[in-house]
């Protein structure tokens, strides 16, 4: 299944290793080469439809998590390759697809040269651990955004720096900061130059973010091609300061005693595949135990978990 780990679906055996690699005791380390024996291969194929309404748009394929690597073909043509078990791989497949039925094929290996960089204390599985999605976006869209909130030295007022990167067809970008009730706190419209632009908001006495008062704002980013809005992206924003002064951890100027835990992206049934319900259960149990800080293992966890 997708998502699903091979070893939990009848293909191969799960391996737990603290220090070392999954082939420890059977094969010698020879980076960047990995053993051929027991390096299982998974092949995936399925058809999908591209609606006519997607004509003229950029079409992206996103694979949320593929262990240990993934080769991608669409309609018999090679699209690309990625290796990083805990980061999403995104491919622009616009020129590979056609309206109507299309064929996608993936090939994955249990181990790759990237496996040498993923030697951490956890269960070793292979497969697709997160969702696979197709997205159609207007030619005028947001490429990247960097948001930097900073409190002043008195932990009272704040600035919010927003830096955007866009495709060439974008003529303007509208920025709107809203409070928890949806009210407009600040807004600005900028014209990117060379696909880049930025602005710094001055925010007077914002509600602060902390573990006890998780106040969040929402930044709306509306992209326009000069004829109308082509894309709107929202991002939660929290205003806080984290620092160490005189060997004391301070959040918004106040001392905090960390009661933390390490959270691996690991499910007793799904392995690396962790459902939203299980994530919420984890959070509920941690709150019951008065845990106020979480280390999200050695890897990037799925985005929806901290959200």
Can you say where each PLM-predicted feature lies in the sequence?
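Surface beta-strand/loop "capping" patches
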Residues: 139-168
